[in-house]
Amino acid sequence: MNPRRKSRLYLAIVVLIGVALTATLMLYALRSNIDLFYTPSEILQGKGENHEKPEVGQRLRIGGMVMPGSVKRDQKTLQVSFKVYDARGAIDVTYTGILPDLFREGQGVVAQGVLGEGNVVNAREVLAKHDEKYTPPEVADAMKENHKGPASAYATPQNEGAKS
């Protein structure tokens, strides 16, 4: 192999290694900023054909309806706990902070946070839904069934969606 070809080969190898390293670092950085959207039933029963459930400690967004009678506020702190339900399940959500003005029982919400032990979502942010007109299509599709399931069908959030 002549020296000119050899130097081009080395340059091509260095460029490929650089591109691979850059792509790996970008994917690693983006991975920590991705929050997947789940409904309560998808957290309890799994999502997709493989029924993949989120892991404890995973960042996620959960969307559903606030179960009537489930909102509990701590009088001494700003901590609030409530249940979010859909047609096939209910999940506990805890949040510390001031809730949006549109937050109320029976209203649609999206909570962003981390999944804790016992399928409890520790939310960092709670968004109250006011109109489905402004909802992304994949979220709107997942939320369509939420209006169908009666909140009284869920005794506890850990009942895996079983009806009483």
Swiss-Prot record:
GO MF entries: heme binding; metal ion binding
One GO BP annotation of this record: cytochrome complex assembly
Compositional bias segments (type: Basic and acidic residues): 131-148
Residues involved in heme binding: H130, Y134
Regions crossing the membrane: 9-29
Entry annotated with the keyword Cell inner membrane: yes
Signal peptide region: none
Residue stretches of biased makeup (Polar residues): 155-164
Residues in the Periplasmic compartment per record: 30-164
Pfam families noted in UniProt: CcmE
Function: Heme chaperone required for the biogenesis of c-type cytochromes. Transiently binds heme delivered by CcmC and transfers the heme to apo-cytochromes in a process facilitated by CcmF and CcmH.
Family indicated by similarity: Belongs to the CcmE/CycJ family.
NCBIfam families, per database record: PRK13165.1, PRK13254.1-1, PRK13254.1-3, PRK13254.1-5
UniProt protein name: Cytochrome c-type biogenesis protein CcmE
